Amino acid sequence: SEKSLISLTKFAEDNGSFLFSSPGDFSSLNLLRRINTTAYKVSSGQFTNIAIIEEMIKDNIPIIFSTGMAKEEDIERGINLCDKNNFYNFALLYCVSLYPTSSQQLNIDYINHLEKKYNVITGYSDHTIGELACLAAVSMGAKIIEKHFTTDNTLTGADNALSMSPENFKKMCENIRNIEKMKYIS
């Protein structure tokens, strides 16, 4: 509901973060506009929804594209659409849309392929269990990490088993910061 989104947005801001979401239709997009979202995410299933992406571009706020179910030509079409509209405030997240994703299914080097081929900010949308794939992605240059979050791993749901508890999420973030320190001399 709109009230819930407003509450979540305030909670995120109060904790030094921000809320963004993947609108699947124009009604959801307009709801995000009303709450003054600071970014949009295009889920991999929406990558070919040109009309909604064009509408997002008009708002001139960051767009994060997830590539999970997108083919290479879909990615190129999305980037060309941004190019055509002189919009360059976007990133591509590498993703494997399997719940959960095993290490053998990852091909995490694809992050480097996306960055080199398209010369854009890249990240990783994770569906593995644990933090290892996220840490590997950061060590390979991912600038954005998306990881599912839960307060209770015993709940039912397609993504709950691979979601992180608050404690594990905090530890993952600390490990990411340590990797960043190892990579860059300030």
Regions found by a protein language model. Give the residues of each.
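Catalytic cores and adjacent flexible loops of soluble metabolic enzymes
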Residues: 1-186
